[in-house]
C-alpha cells in the first residue's frame, strides 16, 4: 500500500524493476494500482503477480501483457477466510521456490511439513489454548530489517483470527523500547 500512496519513494525510472505482487483474489484496488503506477513511472518494468484467482485482475492483466508472467496457485488455496492463511502461505512458499530453487523445493517443503506435523503431535491436545486460559489482552511481534514484514503480518493475522478480541501490535526491537513497551 505504501507504493500506491508514495510511488516515487519506491519507483526509480532510471533502473529496471521487477514488481512481485501477492494477491489472493488479485482484485484489490491497491494491487492493481501498484501495477499501473509501476508501468506508468518505470520504462523497463516487469511483473510477477502471484495469485490464487484465475479470474482476478492481476492474473488476467498478466496473461495479456508482454512484460508479465503470472504464478497461479491451486484453486484450493483461494481461501475465503478473512485471515487468508492457506493462500498467503502458498504464495510465499511459491515465491521462495522461484527465487531460491536450490534451497526451497518439493523435498524441503515435505521436510518442513513433516517437522510441523511432529511438533503439533508432540504438543498434544489444543482444546485448551496454547497459553492456557490466561486472559491475554494484547500481543506484540518484534522484527526489524527483513523481518519487519513478518512481524507486521503476524500481528495482522492474530488480529484477524481473534476478530479483534486480542490487540496485536508490531515494532522493531529497538523501536519497541521507546514508548510502545508501555503496552506490556
Descriptions of predicted regions:
Residues 1-114:
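Glycine-rich phosphate-binding loops that contact phosphosugars or nucleotide phosphates
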Residues 63-184:
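Active-site phosphate/pyrophosphate-binding segments
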Amino acid at each position: 500500500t505504501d507504493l500506491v500512496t508514495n510511488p516515487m519513494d519506491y519507483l526509480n525510472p532510471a533502473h529496471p524493476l521487477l514488481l512481485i505482487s501477492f494477491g489472493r483474489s488479485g482484485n484489490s484496488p491497491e494491487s492493481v494500482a501498484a501495477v499501473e503506477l509501476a508501468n506508468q513511472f518505470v520504462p523497463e518494468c516487469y511483473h510477477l503477480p502471484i495469485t490464487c484467482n484465475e479470474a482476478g485482475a492481476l492474473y488476467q492483466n498478466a496473461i495479456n501483457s508482454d512484460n508479465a508472467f503470472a504464478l497461479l496457485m491451486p484453486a484450493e488455496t483461494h481461501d475465503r477466510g478473512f485471515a487468508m492463511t492457506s493462500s498467503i502461505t502458498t504464495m510465499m512458499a511459491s515465491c521462495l521456490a522461484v527465487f531460491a530453487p536450490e534451497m526451497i523445493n518439493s523435498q524441503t517443503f515435505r521436510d518442513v511439513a513433516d517437522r510441523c506435523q511432529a511438533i503439533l503431535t508432540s504438543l498434544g491436545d489444543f482444546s485448551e489454548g496454547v497459553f492456557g486460559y490466561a486472559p491475554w489482552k494484547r500481543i506484540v511481534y518484534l522484527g526489524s530489517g527483513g523481518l519487519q514484514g513478518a512481524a507486521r503480518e503476524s500481528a495482522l493475522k492474530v488480529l484477524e483470527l481473534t476478530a479483534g478480541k486480542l490487540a496485536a501490535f508490531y515494532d522493531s526491537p529497538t523501536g519497541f523500547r521507546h514508548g510502545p513497551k508501555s503496552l506490556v
